Every structure is written in C-alpha cells, then in structure tokens.
From Swiss-Prot:
Keywords: Glycogen biosynthesis. The gene is glgD. GO terms for biological process: glycogen biosynthetic process. GO terms for molecular function: glucose-1-phosphate adenylyltransferase activity. Belongs to the bacterial/plant glucose-1-phosphate adenylyltransferase family. Gene3D superfamilies: Hexapeptide repeat proteins, Spore Coat Polysaccharide Biosynthesis Protein SpsA, Chain A. It comes from the Bacteria. InterPro entries: ADP-Glc_PPase, GlgDAde_trans, GlmU/GlgC-like_hexapep, NTP_transferase_dom, Nucleotide-diphossugar_trans, Trimer_LpxA-like_sf. This is Glycogen biosynthesis protein GlgD. Required for the synthesis of glycogen. Induction: Expressed exclusively on media containing carbon sources that allow efficient sporulation. Pfam families: Hexapep_GlmU, NTP_transferase. It comes from Bacillus subtilis (strain 168).
Length: 343
C-alpha cells in the first residue's frame, strides 16, 4: 500500500440541468445506481482501496440524502479518530444554478488542507463510475515527475487529477486573482506553467451527466462483460448496508436478464431490468428495459417499457408508460398514479 500518501477530494458542487429529473431532491453523487449503490460510492471506494484515509466531500445543494447515505463513513472504514471522512458544505446561501465554482468552496475550508499531512491529493467529481487503482496513477505521477496527472479514457478527460497538496493549495489561493473557478479551469489555464501528464485508463468508465447516459450506462451493467469490469473482487465497491429479506418470486412470475436487489416481491414479468430494494411488481404486470428504484409499488396489469422510476413511486392498476432509449420516461421520486395520469 502507499501508506496514506494521498488525500481524497470529491467535488460535489456540480449541477447538471440534464439530470434534474433525478436530482430534484438529491445531489448528483446521491443518485441511486446499479441496484444498490449511489454514484459517489464508486469514487469513494476507489480512494479507500488506494489506502486513502482522509477524504473531503464538498457538496453544494440538496445534500441531506448524501449525508444520510455516507454517515460517518463506517462502510468505507473512514470512521476514524485521525483523518476519516469530512463533509464541507458551502457556508454561503446560493441557488443551485449559481456557478461560483468549487475553488470558492475549497477556499472556505482551507484549514482542512493546512491540517492535512498527506503529500499528494486526488481530486475527482462524484459522478464518474469506474474502478481505478489510484496507487498506480500516483506511481506514474512520481516516476514521470509531473506537476499534475489527469486521467483520460479514449482521449476524454474523466475529471480526475493527482497533484501535490502544496500545488493544490497554491491553486486555491490564486483562483480569484487568476480567474479560474474549478480544477479543470485551473489545469487548462496553467498548462503552460505546469507539467501536465495524461494517464490513460483502460478499464470501464462512465461519466453520468445526463438522464440518457444514466440510463445507457445502467443498462450496460446487466451485461456480464461490463459488470465484471466494475465490480472486482480485489477492488470492492462499498456502500451503505441495509438488511432486507430475500426477494420473493410469485408462482407466475418470470425474470429474465435482470439485476434484482433484496426485499422485492415479484408477481409479474421482468425482462432486462434493474430493480432496487423492496420493489413490488403486481400480477399480470410486464416490465421491460426499466430501472425501478427503491420501494416503488407497481400495481397489477401494468405495462412499463424504458421507464426510470425513482424511489417511492406508486403506480396504479393497468397503467401503461413508455419512453425510448434516447429519452427514457422518468417518474420522479414520490410520484403517485393520479399525478402521473394528470401530468
């Protein structure tokens, strides 16, 4: 291991208008994903697996569900007397559309960076799904002698950076004077003054920045060739543990090529779907190519295709709803059948 050489920084200040149907009541990193996880679980687990023992999360808005999910960081072994998981919301009142940038929020909590003893910092967003070994990125960073290492896949930045903690503090100090708001802008504007090295990541990666990408990359994980690249035995993805009984399959239910979490009651037909915990599918109901989140209740004789149902949705008997692969139909959190019919 790398003996706690790295500090983890997760930038949760991003707002994506194209994900507003899924972020109306939560922050980006708290979006449920892959049947039992939240988006932030992937980057946080990557950091912990690289022996990063101090992780700072900088949320901007609607972060109650994120705080509830992360707690004190026990599931990630970050509930520590020294170092651990830190949560740094903005002390300023603002609207979620305000684009003040992450560096302003970093600067509001500079004492955290001053107290940190780690030599290097890993800075990432909360909405990139991958299973990357940061210890190898750091090794390359040290061998080449870079000021900044930026992680790419197929020529596209994954918005993941490694640099010295000293350099990060310098960039935070200078952000107002030099006119950059985020780490991405800082790297671009300082490219002539700093040695910036690309690191090509060859594993599975998905940047979730729209409903279409959320749907596409979620459905990819039904396929073993994708699932096996993300969920590695030697690099586990951790999440908040919730105890549920095994899923109950009714006498006339059929389930094909689907991911099904615990606690469900399935009495209908499910094909190419992802079902989160405690979902109920009524008799005679058919689901195809759907993502059904926690505690959704679907009545009898419904027909749903290419639908994303957020948490706690209630769908009445004989309801039909469909989207497309490019525009899946999103049923917002807490929606009930009457509201759906009138919308």
């Amino acid at each position: 291991m790398f003996n706690n050489q790295m500090l983890g920084v997760i930038d949760e200040t991003t707002y994506k208008h194209s994900l507003q149907d899924l972020t109306a009541q939560r922050s980006l990193g708290a979006i449920p994903f892959a049947g039992r996880y939240r988006l932030i679980d992937f980057m946080l687990s990557n950091m912990v697996n690289a022996d990063i023992r101090s992780v700072a999360i900088f949320p901007k808005y609607r972060y109650r569900s994120l705080m509830d999910h992360l707690g004190a960081g026990k599931e990630w072994d970050l509930h520590r007397k020294k170092d651990g998981l830190f949560f740094f919301p903005s002390p300023h009142l603002h609207h979620e559309y305000d684009e003040f940038g992450s560096f302003r929020q970093f600067s509001d909590h500079l004492d955290y960076f001053h107290r940190s003893t780690q030599q290097y910092a890993v800075i990432s967003n909360s909405h990139t799904v991958c299973n990357i070994q940061f210890q190898y990125v750091l090794k390359r960073h040290q061998e080449v002698g870079c000021d900044v290492t930026e992680v790419f896949q197929d020529g596209q930045s994954l918005q993941i950076y490694i640099m010295s903690t000293t350099l990060l503090k310098d960039l935070i100090y200078g952000h107002s004077e030099k006119g950059y708001k985020t780490i991405q802008e800082a790297v671009e504007k300082e490219s002539s003054a700093l040695t910036i090295c690309p690191y090509e990541y060859s594993g599975y990666a998905a940047v979730i920045d729209s409903v279409e990408k959320y749907y596409t990359h979620s459905m990819e994980l039904i396929q073993p060739r994708f699932w096996q690249q993300v969920f590695l035995p030697q690099q586990p993805i951790y999440t908040k543990v919730k105890d549920e009984p095994p899923t109950k399959y009714g006498k006339h239910s059929t389930v094909k090529n689907s991911l099904v979490a615990n606690g469900c009651v399935l009495e209908g037909e499910v094909e190419n779907c992802i079902l989160f915990r405690a979902v109920h599918v009524g008799k005679g109901t058919k689901l195809k190519n759907c993502i059904i989140m926690q505690k959704t209740q679907i009545g009898e004789d419904c027909l749903l295709e290419q639908v994303i149902s957020d948490k706690d949705v209630k769908i009445g008997k004989a309801t039909e709803a469909a989207g497309t692969a490019e525009q899946p139909l999103v049923l917002r959190k807490g929606l009930v059948q009457g509201e759906l019919m009138n919308s």
